[in-house]
Amino acid sequence: MLKVLDHPLIKIKLTNMRNRESGHSVFRQNLNEIGSLMVYEILRDYQTKRKEIITSINKKYLGYEFDKDVVFVPILRAGLGMIDGLLKLIPEAKVGHIGMSRDETTFKPTEYFYKIPEVPKDSYIFVVDPMLATGNSAVDAITRLRKDGFNNISLVCLVGVKEGVDNVEKHFGHDINIYLAALDECLNKDKYIEPGLGDAGDRIFGTK
């Protein structure tokens, strides 16, 4: 199910990222900040359980913690750019990695790395990638995680298009929550999002 997070701060920071005059440091800073804002909104939907602690004046207190492990799984390499912002609010979360490279002719992804923490199969898994373009990388990543037995998976992206959303929903129906900061207009002939952000990986790391 698609959820576009409509928040003024997200819109302003996303404008900074879209600006071609923004260098990699500005791009990266705004990406991290949007990640924190997104995870704050996303986790409204998730359950907590009670946790007993002892306060600094030696009193018992019944507080809260998430009822399941939280795991962020960035799709390399661009997904790494969002991780610091996500972990800022949930430092106890674990992080897995899925490496995908895109064939520039067929636009199909190929997996080259996969490592996920040892956590219960019902953990909250968030696949992270700034861009949801064709959706092929997201579909392959989610399929791989499901093959490993994980069934509580969500997709967190900054910018997406209908084609990518439809591709994910074609494979998984509404079982997957898709969280976007913005739903953009279309893909161009090179399968880049318009108006988009450009190549997110290059803009995060200052490469070309």
From Swiss-Prot:
Enzyme class label: transferase
Q: Gene3D superfamilies per the record?
A: 3.40.50.2020
Key words, A-Z: Allosteric enzyme, Glycosyltransferase, GTP-binding, Magnesium, Nucleotide-binding, Transferase
The coenzyme or cofactor needed here is: Mg(2+)
Q: Which InterPro entries match?
A: PRibTrfase_dom, PRTase-like, Upp_B, UPRTase/APRTase, Ura_phspho_trans
Activity modulation = Allosterically activated by GTP.
The protein depicted here goes by the name Uracil phosphoribosyltransferase
Q: Coiled coil: which residue ranges?
A: none
Q: How and how many cofactors are bound, per the record note? A: Binds 1 Mg(2+) ion per subunit. The magnesium is bound as Mg-PRPP.
Q: What is its EC number?
A: 2.4.2.9
Family of the protein in this entry: Belongs to the UPRTase family.
Role description: Catalyzes the conversion of uracil and 5-phospho-alpha-D-ribose 1-diphosphate (PRPP) to UMP and diphosphate.
Which pathway does the protein contribute to? Pyrimidine metabolism; UMP biosynthesis via salvage pathway; UMP from uracil: step 1/1
Is Translocase among this UniProt entry's keywords? no
State the Gene Ontology terms under molecular function.
GTP binding; magnesium ion binding; uracil phosphoribosyltransferase activity
**Entry keyword GTP-binding:** yes
Q: Where does 5-phospho-alpha-D-ribose 1-diphosphate bind?
A: 77, 102, 129-137, 199
Q: Which residues does the record give as uracil binding sites? A: 193, 198-200
Question: What reaction is this protein's catalytic activity?
Answer: UMP + diphosphate = 5-phospho-alpha-D-ribose 1-diphosphate + uracil
Q: Which GO terms describe its biological process?
A: UMP salvage; uracil salvage
